[in-house]
């Protein structure tokens, strides 16, 4: 694939793909034009548009190709990189008012950078080298990588190998000289249809009996054996009704889907964990550390919510009423708490053994993961 430079390039890259997608029980022929799916594509495309308009914020120089790439593809080489990721995330939240779907992939490969290195250190494998080779390939074309961690899980009191249905967690069902075959499902996968590649990862701490579930690998989203079940959200169908009013966020939307894997092949060159169950928890913990901090994007969405609430108050002539002003102030306090703790976490990051930087876990815990935007006063 030719390198993606612009929003238009990105939209062109999504054309003529062979994907099996079901939405409300029907097969989707063209996700690019479907009224429910299209706004989510526009939100993802905004990550490229921002890099065009503000390259110093939304792009970086690849350490592997020495060429500009989207910042969502960049490995954090210092605390400033972590900080700029947050600045970009808040800006995109302001621009789209929704999820722009690239944070999971960014946080996944930043976590994998150090975890693959430490697996190699213990087991003398070559995962880190293969991972860097894969990442270089992604940088050369400036692609979107999605992260797939959340399994369906089933009975939460039992580990994967004790589930009544073994497909409730993604697992290796066959190995050969060329790679592995996986089956199972990943739930609530953000922006998966709008990505070019996905990286599958375990979702929890594993034991030796769960070795087949300790798999990390990259694969194109068009891989044979994958089916996507699109997860519709409240009021989605309004976009399919005539007219332009009362559709909520008119231009942008988030996207989640269940991804079903039926004997899907992952070649050896794209496998970055294969049975090293004792590193599953490390990967989940490091991914979670990055991802909690990434909820700074919600501060950008919160800015939109606060602005909308203030505008509604003004339209109704109550913008100066004390109880309205009090609620708007409270919304701002909660929103800036999200931002402040995320930024504090990024600026106090530390270098890992592999040389990239991970943010401070302490400041992620009370921050965006608290999802303060969900507690903003609804009566404002």
Segments predicted by a language model, with ranges:
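Gly/Pro-rich turn-and-neighbor structural signature
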Residues: 117-181
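N-terminal-proximal low-complexity accessory segments that begin disordered
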Residues: 2-45
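Extended amphipathic alpha-helical segments enriched in small hydrophobics
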Residues: 294-352
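Hydrophobic alpha-helical segments, chiefly the membrane-spanning helices
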Residues: 376-380
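Internal helix-loop-helix
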Residues: 49-145
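Short, surface-exposed, low-complexity cationic segments
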Residues: 32-50, 193-202
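FAD-binding core of flavoproteins
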Residues: 152-297
């Amino acid at each position: 694939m030719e390198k993606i430079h612009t929003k238009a390039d990105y939209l062109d890259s999504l054309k003529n793909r062979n994907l099996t997608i079901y939405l409300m029980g029907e097969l989707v022929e063209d996700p690019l034009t479907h009224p429910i799916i299209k706004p989510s594509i526009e939100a993802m495309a905004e990550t490229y548009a921002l890099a065009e308009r503000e390259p110093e914020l939304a792009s970086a120089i690849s350490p592997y190709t020495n060429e500009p790439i989207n910042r969502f593809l960049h490995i954090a080489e210092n605390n400033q990189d972590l900080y700029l990721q947050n600045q970009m995330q808040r800006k995109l939240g302001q621009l789209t008012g929704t999820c722009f779907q690239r944070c999971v992939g960014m946080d996944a490969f930043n976590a994998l950078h150090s975890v693959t290195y430490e697996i190699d250190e213990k087991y003398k494998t070559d995962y880190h080298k293969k991972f860097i080779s894969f990442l270089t390939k992604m940088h050369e074309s400036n692609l979107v990588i999605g992260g797939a961690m959340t399994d369906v899980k089933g009975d939460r009191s039992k580990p994967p190998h004790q589930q009544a249905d073994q497909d409730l967690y993604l697992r290796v069902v066959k190995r050969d000289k060329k790679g592995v075959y996986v089956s199972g499902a990943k739930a609530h996968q953000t922006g998966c249809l709008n990505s070019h590649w996905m990286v599958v990862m375990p979702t929890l701490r594993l034991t030796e009996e769960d070795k087949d579930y300790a798999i990390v690998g990259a694969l194109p989203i068009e891989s044979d054996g994958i089916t996507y079940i699109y997860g519709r959200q409240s009021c989605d169908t309004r976009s399919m009704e005539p007219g332009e009013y009362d559709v909520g966020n008119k231009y942008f939307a988030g996207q989640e889907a269940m991804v079903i894997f039926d004997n899907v092949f992952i070649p050896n060159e794209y496998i970055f964990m294969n049975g090293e169950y004792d590193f599953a928890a490390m990967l989940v913990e490091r991914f979670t550390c990055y991802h909690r901090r990434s909820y700074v994007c919600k501060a950008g969405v919160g800015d939109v919510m606060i602005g909308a609430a203030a505008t509604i108050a003004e339209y109704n002539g109550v913008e100066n009423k004390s109880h309205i002003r009090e609620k708007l102030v409270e919304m701002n306090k909660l929103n800036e708490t999200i931002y402040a703790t995320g930024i504090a976490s990024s600026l106090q990051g530390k270098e890992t053994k592999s040389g990239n930087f991970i943010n401070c876990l302490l400041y992620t815990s009370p921050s965006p993961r608290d999802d303060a935007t969900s507690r903003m006063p609804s009566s404002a």
